[in-house]
Amino acid sequence: MANNTLHRYLFEDLSVRGELVQLDDAYQQIISSKEYPKPVQNLLGELLVATTLLTATLKFEGSITLQLQGNGPVSLVVINGDNDQKVRGVARFEGEIADDATLHQLMGKGYLVITISPKDGERYQGVVALEGKDLAECFEGYFERSEQLKTRLWLRLGEFEGKPHAAGMLLQVMPDGTGSSDDFEHLEQLTDTVKNEELFSLEAEDVLYRLYNQDKVQLFEPQNVEFFCGCSRERSGGAIITIERSEVDDIIATEGKVSLHCDYCGTSYDFDSIDVAHLFEEATKGNDTVH
């Protein structure tokens, strides 16, 4: 099957649109950057699926960042995705976490922060209290309040062929106002029957046929979803030269090197005294050229 793909579709006679995302490698790369407990892996997976589904609604170049913030053992979960479906994510946690911990046990009193950042235009940010029984319910509440559109999400995590998989579906009434609540409930009931194994193993066309073969469904071209953190040695060097040279020299005197670690992909970039001298020398040359 085609993994790491997002599919959009439309129910031609019912004024309802849908999305289906199936992820394996993109999800696995995010959770492999640290030794995350299983419940934290699941939170990252659910937020990743939700981010992918939401970025599909963007009608412009830009990005969406979803953050879970709380005062529980998990203080932060962040997923960022853009209109090209390049995604990355990280989580912060402390202490022992029970394998069966719920969303509220993990996050404590928490919030879902949704930040939409167009390439051109003003940034939008919405904050939603984590009041639903699960993450999908929190997102549904957000859509109902912010867009006044009936929306349902299904966020699924699990193992398939020995590897972690993540998948999800979204149904939303079209904003033209012609969709009926009965039609939407009919599609909800059908989608509720989808099994994890089907989402992890079947092609999108087969999943949709299994669920909606009595309805007319228009399936659009899929979009690939790709893990992309954006870190590089050059960017890390650029960060070092923003620090006072004396502070950098003190670190090298103590540690023997300056190390920068990318939380998104787990890569570390090390700079010794020769590297640092070269960085500051090049920065000085650049400043002289400007003046």
From Swiss-Prot:
Q: By its UniProt entry, which Pfam families does this protein fall under?
A: HSP33 (PF01430)
> What about PTM?
Under oxidizing conditions two disulfide bonds are formed involving the reactive cysteines. Under reducing conditions zinc is bound to the reactive cysteines and the protein is inactive.
Native source organism of the sequence: Aliivibrio salmonicida (strain LFI1238)
Q: State the disulfide connectivity.
A: 229-231, 262-265
Keywords of the record, alphabetical order, are: Chaperone, Cytoplasm, Disulfide bond, Redox-active center, Stress response, Zinc
Entry-linked PANTHER family: 33 KDA CHAPERONIN
Q: Where in the cell is it found?
A: Cytoplasm
Gene that produces this protein: hslO
Family under the similarity heading: Belongs to the HSP33 family.
Any one Gene Ontology molecular-function term assigned to this protein's record: unfolded protein binding
Q: What is this protein called?
A: 33 kDa chaperonin
